[in-house]
Curated annotation (Swiss-Prot):
Keyword Transferase: no
Any one Gene Ontology BP term: photosynthesis, light reaction
Catalysis performed (reactions): a plastoquinone + NADH + (n+1) H(+)(in) = a plastoquinol + NAD(+) + n H(+)(out); a plastoquinone + NADPH + (n+1) H(+)(in) = a plastoquinol + NADP(+) + n H(+)(out)
Entry protein name: NAD(P)H-quinone oxidoreductase subunit 3
Amino acid sequence: MFALPGYDAFLGFLLIAAAVPVLALVTNKLLAPKSRAGERQLTYESGMEPIGGAWIQFNIRYYMFALVFVIFDVETVFLYPWAVAFNRLGLLAFIEALIFIAILLVALAYAWRKGALEWS
């Protein structure tokens, strides 16, 4: 098929993987009803009649807590494989993990010092 014959199946997989979502979106666009008024513009609240407007302002502090959570959630994702392979990796990997944790603790201390974790 092309210059690397061992990768024909992989190229076919990539083409199919790209074509399936595009085909699904095009099919949806062609077959979906075209109504743009009425209940489609209302906010969905678990089958109940909507109360109030859909646009409300959230306190920015929610976003700060979410960012801190995401940072430490990603830390957990990176440290779990390291912990599983701890015996095989040796001292250098342990030092690298300590540096990684130290950098994140500095970020936490900075956020704490700036008052990002205060709710007053």
